[in-house]
Amino acid sequence: MSAHMSGLEIMDEDQLIKDVLDKFLNCHEQTYDEEFLNTFTHLSQEDHVSKRGVFGTDSSENIFTSAKVTHKNEADDYHLRNKTIFLRTSSQCLEEQVDNFLDLEDLDMDEEIKPQMSEDLLLLPGEVEQDVSTSIPSCIPFVAQPPTCEVKPKPSVKRMDKQTEEILGDEVQLFSLDEEFDYDNVMLTSKFSPAEIENIKELCKQQKRKDTSPDLEKSCD
């Protein structure tokens, strides 16, 4: 009996293998056409756009497009409900994110485009600022000078004032000599007045006396 049963099992296995091979060989050749692509569940073009958060579309259209893709069974219905909830929440999040952006009309584009440059960078080589600051420095260095009563105005100062009065333009002006000024006969003026020179001499003599007095005391000792 055991040998007969084993023989039947072998025949059944052979028959099953033969049937499987026949089905495989007799089935029609499957190509990459619409029939083959329809076997896969994929998102349509409309569903892809709605998932990106295109505003102005109705939520019922998103539900309808997602319902066409899923199968009509309970498990797929549950998947569909989760999918529609995700689409709604994602679109709401995108709407809130867009609302946080500022309108271009509210921004002053001229202020952001124009670089904040200091006035010093706009000066050409050799130019001087026209607005001279008149503020007093916080720290003035002390220089031992004799008391002065009068200060004579110098002609060079007048010439500098005339040059500063000229309007500086963007074009570089060529250097030219003043035809009215006699460069050969220039009157040299002293930096100090005669009274100031006398005071300086007196101070020098006093300083020499102070320096020589300790030496004399040492020699006497």
Curated annotation (Swiss-Prot):
Alphabetical UniProt keywords: Phosphoprotein
Keyword S-adenosyl-L-methionine attached: no
GO molecular function annotation: intraciliary transport particle A binding
Pfam families: IFTAP
Top-rank taxon: Eukaryota
Gene Ontology annotations for the cellular component aspect, listed alphabetically: 9+0 non-motile cilium; cytosol
Signal peptide residues on this chain, from the entry's feature table: none
Keyword Membrane: no
Modified residues (Phosphoserine): S59
Gene Ontology biological process terms in this record: acrosome reaction; spermatogenesis
Reported function: Seems to play a role in ciliary BBSome localization, maybe through interaction with IFT-A complex.
Oligomer and partners: Interacts with IFT122; the interaction associates IFTAP with IFT-A complex.
Protein name, UniProt field: Intraflagellar transport-associated protein
